Amino acid sequence: MELFELTIHELHDKLKKKEVSSVEATRALLARIDAVEPRVNAFITVTPEEALKNAEAADRRIAAGDMQLLTGIPIALKDIFLTKGVRTTCASRILDNFIPPYDATSVARLKAQGMVLVGKLNQDEFAMGSSTESSYYGKTHNPWNLECIPGGSSGGSAAAIAARQAIATLGTDTGGSIRQPASHCGCVGLKPTYGRVSRYGVIAYASSLDQVGPVTRDVTDCAIMLGAVAGFDPKDSTSVDLPVPDYSKALSNDVKGLKIGLPKEYFIAGLDPDVQKTMDAAIETYKGLGAQFVEISLPHTDYAVATYYLIATAEASSNLARYDGVRFGHRSSEAQGLIDMYRKSRSEGFGEEVKRRIMLGTYALSSGYYDAYYLKAQKVRTLIMQDFSRAFEEVDVILTPVAPTPAFRIGEKSADPLQMYLSDIFTIPVNLAGTCGMSIPAGFSKDGLPVGLQLVGRPFGEECILRAAYAFEQNTDWHERKASL
């Protein structure tokens, strides 16, 4: 097995036993990036010099006996995380030349463990999308089929794992942006409970929905990464002051008696036959392990997409007002005065999808429509939260598809925003409820594309979904399959 194919825990063991150095592992990974990046386009920025410098420092740390789980591990980050001294664009022209003066809290926590940063990953512009087609830096391709999308908005984070261009990655999830690409690329992706991981230093899209999480090769790595970034942060007012459990200790091959809910609103006519077949097989696997299934109802599911696209766009129109060409970012060189500079800088700097969402959000917040749209959406959000609360009185975990179809072809839904928005129909409710959910590899379509299953837990119930995911992984081999690039 090549060094770039290892998991975090496998590479950690080799580093600990001095069988390999971090510099060797990092060089192998950088060579892999060079080899496949022209076909995948998972990265916006690759940082070879910084990576090798970090790897040398990690090797010194290991030699001194000061080793943590991520010391010397090559990791890549979605280009939405501020990284001190490393360009951070959010895949937008408006931030093309932006170099942050500080690190996001999650980045600082990974650096404190001694991670090796190999680069910043492609995404949908400002995390607005489900296909990683809206990036200013070009489309990312799915390593399983280069003519298909990798999912979005954290498409680069999932594609880099599937293409073996990073040992682990970090993404963000606002309406499914970690789980959906993880499903489409055959990776493990986890969206923690809102408030579990600090959002400080993460470029904001929709502040009440955004959450930071890992994309990895297996569930063990996912637990390691979550443990590294989770925890209270006084710099983030939405961060929750709760102790961080040792997620690795939750990993158990025992789900006997675990009550798993199947929401009838998610298993509907119109679900792709390959997705349905994968879900049926996964349910049988869990039954064989002694889990119990209960049919449940999440009655307000039908309203989730409309609710999300009112709340998220409203928050985006406010959050993105700061990009005006004055203090940082793109400034139009053809402006005639201040107001013209605002208009031209934003018109030139933002892509079509970002402009669409800013306009939708501004409309929803306008005085004549605020009550009819934004306020009503917040009320429906509360009903969706209550649906999940009631469900978790009956069950421990909820099992659903991640997406209605496997990865679709690049360009297939670009001209139809509504079709694109509906591809997140099964992931959006989890963000609106503020609870945790994850995608794990569960099978393949007849065309050889990965299909994931979603496990949803109660708020701060990451240990429970990790346990359920680990048990499934131990009894299947989907996570071991590799894209042949």
UniProtKB/Swiss-Prot annotation:
A GO molecular-function annotation: glutaminyl-tRNA synthase (glutamine-hydrolyzing) activity
Recorded catalytic activity of this chain's protein: L-glutamyl-tRNA(Gln) + L-glutamine + ATP + H2O = L-glutaminyl-tRNA(Gln) + L-glutamate + ADP + phosphate + H(+)
BP-aspect Gene Ontology terms: translation
SUPFAM superfamilies: Amidase signature (AS) enzymes (SSF75304)
Active site: K78 (charge relay system), S153 (charge relay system), S177 (acyl-ester intermediate)
GO cellular component term, pick one: glutamyl-tRNA(Gln) amidotransferase complex
NCBIfam families assigned to the protein according to its UniProt record, in alphabetical order: gatA
HAMAP family documented for this protein: GatA
Summary of the function given for this chain in its UniProt record: Allows the formation of correctly charged Gln-tRNA(Gln) through the transamidation of misacylated Glu-tRNA(Gln) in organisms which lack glutaminyl-tRNA synthetase. The reaction takes place in the presence of glutamine and ATP through an activated gamma-phospho-Glu-tRNA(Gln).
Assembly and oligomerization: Heterotrimer of A, B and C subunits.
Name assigned to this protein: Glutamyl-tRNA(Gln) amidotransferase subunit A
Organism taxonomic ancestry: Bacteria, Pseudomonadati, Thermodesulfobacteriota, Desulfuromonadia, Geobacterales
